[in-house]
Amino acid sequence: MHTGIAAAFLPAFCIVAVGAPAQTATEHRKAPEWAISEWINSPGLTLADLRGKVVVIDFFQLWCPGCNKFSIPLMHHWERIFEQERKDGRIAFVSIHTVFEGHSYQRPKRLRTFVEEKNITHPVGIDRHADGRRLPITMERYRTRGTPEMAIIDKQGNIRFQQFGYFEPDHGERLIRTLLAEETGGDT
């Protein structure tokens, strides 16, 4: 996963304008709770359930080329690197299927098959849609700009990194290591 491969698939990212200001990769704000209509690989999970852990979120769509070439393999890679921390309950990986296009194709049944084929074993939530809204609720709350988009949340529940599209994986890995080393404290 080197920056040299970025040019090969940057045009493949799925983009949507949500009318929110662009987020920087280092913006610090409280992570909003997600709104999930259905879970795969989990009986149900809230952000509050993960308090005290570093949380890595992949906002994706099953038909997104950038997700299939970058964020999904990166999640697998990080799960291997941080396997012991995951077993120790210090880090959690979550994917959120944020469908803002191709609704008739990206149905839950197809997603369940996709998750199995891609060997995704961590919790996968299907972002809930509000009546009459094109964009799903969690996508709006996190102000994501498309897919793939990844977020890293610290132990206190603050977004410490959020990036649309490609980014240097080593940067994310270093941040995860830093956050794992931080003491769990009160609200910041």
Give residue ranges: language-model regions.
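Bacterial N-terminal signal peptides
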Residues: 7-17
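Short active-site neighborhood of thiol/selenol oxidoreductases, capturing the structured segment around
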Residues: 45-68
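Alpha/beta-hydrolase fold active-site loops
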Residues: 54-55, 91, 148
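Short, solvent-exposed mixed-charge patches
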Residues: 181, 185-188
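N-terminal "domain-start" segment that seeds a small globular fold
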Residues: 21-48
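Thiol/disulfide oxidoreductase modules built on the thioredoxin-like
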Residues: 118-120, 126-175
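Structural microenvironment flanking redox-active thiols in thiol-disulfide oxidoreductases
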Residues: 68-118, 129-138
